[in-house]
Amino acid sequence: MSKQILILAGDGIGPEIVGAAEQVLTKVNEKFELGLTWEHGLLGGSAIDAHGEPYPAVTSEQAKKADAILLGAVGGPKWDTIERSIRPERGLLKIRSELNLFANLRPALLYPQLADASSLKPEIVAGLDILIVRELTGGIYFGQPRGIRELENGEKQGYNTDVYSESEIKRIAKVAFELAALRGSKVCSVDKANVLEVTELWKQTVTELQQAQYPNIQLSHMYVDNAAMQLVRAPKQFDVIVTGNLFGDILSDEAAMLTGSIGMLPSASLDENGKGMYEPCHGSAPDIAGQNVANPLATILSVAMMLRYTFREEAAAKAIEDAVGQVLDQGLRTADIMSEGMQRVGTVEMGQAVVAALA
């Protein structure tokens, strides 16, 4: 198979964290003789500066050719005042939509070395390992009609449309069930079926699919408000959570903080054939850009997810995850996960330490 990667560093801390991750990618590519090749492109603010738009045609062509994309982060205050339709975040929505990256996988995994970094008591989060499967190309973020209009009385009104078809729900539920079969065989589908018809259909469709094709997977349903509470109250009850775009966006960020730092969490966005875009869960953090303080581990772990889900190189993926564990065992910490008695290091040093652990 082709093994072509497109690297999009993006904005803010993107170039720094991607730089560290690229060193790790180079190391595993050599060590495991993976035969991967890659090129660089522009997305978001950097693309606006160079081409006047967040997702230019040249990047689109590169993305279509690639088997996997490694992204840093997009956005920053520099572009907050330009027209909404060409802001950096629009580039991210466009690439997801164009490549049909409908399945977003967000693990919330607590490294034992970082148990004290969580805001919850250690006994509540110890051993935490949740996978949130979020539908990424439908729902209220993409539904039409949408906009801001003026009513007859002169008052402005904002409106959006939350819409899901049966086929969209089925394909994301299928991903969740397939992944659950490799884990704890437990899926919790999150909806608001008591109020929203769109999630009433969601609940019904997920249930029918489970009964027809995945009878060995334990399925439960939870309203989103309760799910948000349960994630804080007793997070270890969850294994795989599947939900729509809006709910998934919110719950995955909440779950991220159970682990102590969003700087530790990778994500994958996949199409139906395993092509994917891999990126850290955190944003572009322009306030710390260029200071060599950002945590590159989420981006490095995104490389591990890429090797696992797109290239099916499990040994190489596991080697990266083990190397991250070794570095944490050595007491190395970036500022966001720093605790008493540990050694504070910068972005570059953390990346180099992971490379050394892979030797």
Swiss-Prot record:
One of its GO terms (cellular component) is cytosol. Transmembrane segments: none annotated. It comes from the Bacteria. Substrate binds at R96, R106, R134, D225. Binds 1 Mg(2+) or Mn(2+) ion per subunit. The keyword Electron transport does not apply. The record marks Y141, K192 as: Important for catalysis. Its cofactor is Mg(2+); Mn(2+). NAD(+) binds at residues 76-89, 283-295. It is found in: Cytoplasm. GO terms for molecular function: 3-isopropylmalate dehydrogenase activity; magnesium ion binding; NAD binding. It is an enzyme of class 1 (oxidoreductase). It catalyses: (2R,3S)-3-isopropylmalate + NAD(+) = 4-methyl-2-oxopentanoate + CO2 + NADH. Pathway: Amino-acid biosynthesis; L-leucine biosynthesis; L-leucine from 3-methyl-2-oxobutanoate: step 3/4. One of its GO terms (biological process) is L-leucine biosynthetic process. Mg(2+) binds at D225, D249, D253. Its EC number is 1.1.1.85. Keywords: Amino-acid biosynthesis, Branched-chain amino acid biosynthesis, Cytoplasm, Leucine biosynthesis, Magnesium, Manganese, Metal-binding, NAD, Oxidoreductase. Catalyzes the oxidation of 3-carboxy-2-hydroxy-4-methylpentanoate (3-isopropylmalate) to 3-carboxy-4-methyl-2-oxopentanoate. The product decarboxylates to 4-methyl-2 oxopentanoate. Homodimer. HAMAP family: LeuB_type1 (MF_01033). This is 3-isopropylmalate dehydrogenase. The gene is leuB.
